[in-house]
Amino acid sequence: MARVTVEDCIDKVDNRFDLVLLAAHRARMISSGSQLTIDRDNDKNPVVSLREIAEQTVSPEDLREELVHSLQKFVEVDEPEQDTVPLIGSVGASVDADDTEVALERMTEEELLKGLEGLAPPEEQPEEDE
């Protein structure tokens, strides 16, 4: 196989974009010292990785898993969550069904304006000349 084309690999990996991602990841693995599964034949790492995929010496599913693992910053650990979380204010009290509803007070616009009139504006501080 003198030249590797996408058509040689497309039956192993359905999506061309995925093929490029997997081949690039495998080429980076080869650059970092991973063992080759075929002879190099004086080819560069991207060509070797495409040849490995075309000849099925590496599994695209394994490459996909390694790629996802290399891109993960945080590994999610499934831990069981508690069913109920106690409220901060009622540590010793029992939780009732009525406590879960939040009561909101409705305020009219006039009541809001009256409340705002009572607020004093912040004092202006004199500007300092330098």
Curated annotation (Swiss-Prot):
A single GO molecular function term of this UniProt record: DNA binding
Reaction catalysis annotation: RNA(n) + a ribonucleoside 5'-triphosphate = RNA(n+1) + diphosphate
Renumbered residue ranges of the record's region Disordered: 109-130
CC annotations in GO: DNA-directed RNA polymerase complex
E.C. number(s) listed in UniProt: 2.7.7.6
Any GO BP: DNA-templated transcription
Keywords assigned: DNA-directed RNA polymerase, Nucleotidyltransferase, Transcription, Transferase
Spans through the membrane: none
SUPFAM superfamilies linked to this entry: RPB6/omega subunit-like
HAMAP family the UniProt entry points to: RNApol_bact_RpoZ
Assembly and interaction partners: The RNAP catalytic core consists of 2 alpha, 1 beta, 1 beta' and 1 omega subunit. When a sigma factor is associated with the core the holoenzyme is formed, which can initiate transcription.
Family named by the database record: Belongs to the RNA polymerase subunit omega family.
Function as written in the Swiss-Prot or TrEMBL entry: Promotes RNA polymerase assembly. Latches the N- and C-terminal regions of the beta' subunit thereby facilitating its interaction with the beta and alpha subunits.
Name the record gives this protein: DNA-directed RNA polymerase subunit omega
